[in-house]
Structures are given as C-alpha cells and as structure tokens.
Amino acid sequence: DHIVGELMKGFVKKRPVSEEIEKALKTVDPQMGAELSEKLQQGLPAIALTGHAGLTTAFMNDVDGSMTYAEQVLGYGKEGDVFLGISTSGNSKNVLYAAVTAKAKGLKVIGLLGRDGGRIRGYSDTAIVVPEQETFKIQELHLPVYHALCLMLEEYFF
C-alpha cells in the first residue's frame, strides 16, 4: 500500500492534472471542477494486491489462498504492465505464483528480494537483491530501494 501511495499521488513533485482534464472537470461543473483540478494530482496507475479483503477471503475459501495474487495479476494485468514482487526470501509462494502469471501475461517482472533472490529471481526481468540474510534487515533495505524506484519513476514521468 505504501508504494501505491507514492505512485498514485505526488511523492516529492507536484503533479497537477493535465490541461485537458482541468478543462473537462470545469465543463462538467465549473465550481467543483475548479476545486478538483486544483487539488487532484496526476498519478501513475498502481494496485496493491494486498488490499482486497473480499476477493482474498473468497479465493482462500474456494480455491487456494496462495494463488490470490496470481488471480489478481490474471484479472488486472495487461501486456506491458509491470509486476513488482517483494519477498525477503525470494521464495514466497504467493509472490512466486504471481510472478509466473505475470510472465505468462507479458508483464515485466521486477523482483525486490533478499538472501540469494530465491526462485522469484529466475522469473524476474530485473531482480534487485539486497545483501542481507535476516528478514528484518532485508525489510529495512527494501525501504530505500523502493523509495528510489518511486523517485525515478516520478522524475521520468513528471
């Protein structure tokens, strides 16, 4: 969810809506359109696969909980999209299934991993493996890495 927050709104840069969107908003309603175009921020489409409780519990009950992320990649993912899989071991079954599904659908796979990169490394177009073995240390190193990725994306697109 944290990464989605950095991508869907301004992280360090102001991201005003386009003139086209501003005009369309003001056409629909001049007063609200002005307020919306002033306060809304241009985002990069991002979805956290961890935030859909209804789908997750239904899929866990009816099918297999370890495939919940893969199911979402199957439903949401389009060729050319990017799947960012985060796993401290590189072997998290739910992230591994999602990475395989992403590759099958033509998504680019970035693995943010620890230890030796595990099995997910083999399905990643780009594997970022932080040099630690202990879970808490891997998690601490993942934070500046994904912040750097968000900063680079924001700089590139805005």
Residue ranges and their predicted role:
Residues 1-158:
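Glycine-rich phosphate-binding loops that contact phosphosugars or nucleotide phosphates
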